[in-house]
Amino acid sequence: MGKKPSENSFDYIIIGAGTAGGIIAKKLTDDHYTSVLVLEAGINMTKELSNPNVVTALTNATDNKQSYNVATILEQQIGRQLIAQSGRVIGGSSEHNAMLAVRGSRDLYDEWARLVGNQWSYDSIRSLFKKNETYTGVTQDPEERGFNGPIFVRQQMIPNQGVIQTLSQATSEVFQIPIVEDYNTGIRDCTFFKSQFTQKAKNESFVRSSTSTGYLNRHVVTQGNEFKSDELGVNGRKLMILAKTTVNKILFKEHKGVQIAVGVEFIKDGVSKVMYANKGIIVSAGNFSSVILQRSGIGKPEDLAKAGIKTLIDSPNVGHNFQTHFYAGMGVRVETGRLLQVLGADPNQPLLFGAFKKQDNPTGGRRLQLLGLPVPEFVPVQDVLKNGWQFDPTQPNNIMSIAILNVNPRSRGTVLIAHSDPEAYPTIDMNPLADNDDLNFAIDKYIETYNMIVRARQLDPGGIYEVVYPDESIFQLPNEQEKRTILAAHVRASYTDFTHYGGQCKMGRTIEEGVVDGFLNVFGTRNLKVADLSVAPILPDGNPSTGAQMIGLNAVRFIRNYEKFHELEDFESSDSSDFESSDSSGYESIDSSDFESSS
């Protein structure tokens, strides 16, 4: 391998133009001096994915054109596989998620600060949340909200009175939590009438607001399509997004005993290529971030050996500590007119109620999230079909469903490299219910949520009827052990992930604790960061897309304010023949002569 060709280098290379990576790319190039290359597996599908309807979003997420849908191993505790979904478009999962806007609680981020440093405390990152958003709703605490940011957040439209108010009142009483107007103020325990969504008003309706629309729009980069997928910065911005690329690995050069990240090897149009970074490489590949590190030789040696990868850096936590938010489902019979009121008020996002509550430990954030829909979405489909519970507006009553989420499960899984082939999917084990505490938590919250429905029925006996899944009679069993045994079976039957993932490159204070430090630098390297939800020591305690965007913004803050973590010493004068990589003879270089004002 000869000298690095100067036309094939950028200041930074970002792997992934997703929820966090797209933000980093935009913000780093705002000075029109810093040059950034982004390597993205997907293409721009902003127009195709603009629909604000939650059902459409859930359907789109199953399409492999814009999403990776990777089956897990057979999960022993539930007897079936789960599907790990992640974005495969510019904008990442912010382009096909359900659009719920949830920051997470002050307590959660203060726990991050306790674990890895005050730069992650809620007081340190509040300004990032505010700068990220344009909030168009009502709040009890205006100082907590932003009103001039790139991501639009709206409140749900609801009827003046009805089932939403009934369920929220019952939730407040039974779970002993307050009803608030706005849950995105750092508050931990609460219930609320109006959920919030990342959507912008347009033509008397709404469109999705995402990293793509807010940070990588036509004012920032040219807009690619299926036939011309790459995107270039406009108006002198030094940004290039290479779409339809698959990253193989990161290239390193050893300097004074430290592995310095200097380039990225990737595949585009069936050809292996290499590009170089003068200042740093940022991995923002979501579920695949740990896999890219492993393919680059960073990980636990026994994990790497199984895929035929030689160990460059023994980093035992890479691919471990994988977390998701799991839920058990409940179904309740409700008078149809009450459900139609909610469906009519906000057809795109007809949520019935929501709630958050703390975990058992005295420190840390929430563990419980409740989410209600006017359809049996959270009930196992086989039970819906067997009992004829599909929503039918002509019937006098229908089945609403409640997701009883564990947003800080004790069980942890893995995302591990399965093959040295960069096109191969990883081996994913979500490991649900591996810790029996999670099963007991779900059973306890089943019972508590049932008690909430009993209270709601007292408040509205003509509209709230019986619990049908699990059957109401189970909750009334006099034998406590029998009740819990039967409820455990319903937990296992309905237990599913909520497509919220992270933790497999978690932050820690040492390489024994984590994969990256509190400033996102990969232990054992220089000039290499990871910046996405995979760095979360504990997942944000709610729908985590907003948290992922905050991580991207904080990464930019670190890069700008802690440049000492990034500057590569003496690289320009060094010979690249001793890079820590496979022989790259025959690799094709990218001609960046058409890159607008590239350095």
Indicate residue ranges for each PLM-predicted region:
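Glycine-rich loop(s) and the adjacent beta-strand/alpha-helix scaffold that form part
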Residues: I23, K27, D31-L37, G42-K47, ...
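Mid-to-C-terminal "cap/lid" subdomains and adjacent gly/pro-rich loops that border
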Residues: Q156, G236-K238, V291, K300-N408, ...
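Extreme N-terminal leader/targeting segments of oxidoreductases
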Residues: M1-D11, F558-L568
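N-terminal glycine-rich phosphate/pyrophosphate-binding loop and immediately adjacent elements
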Residues: G2-K130, K310-N317, T324-V334
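Long, intrinsically disordered low-complexity tandem-repeat segments
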Residues: F571-S597
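A glycine-rich dinucleotide-binding beta-alpha-beta segment and adjacent secondary-structure elements
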Residues: A243, N248-L251, L459-L539
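A conserved FAD-binding loop/helix module that cradles the flavin
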Residues: I538-R557
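Conserved redox-cofactor binding core of oxidoreductases
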Residues: A113-K249, K253, A261, Y469-P470
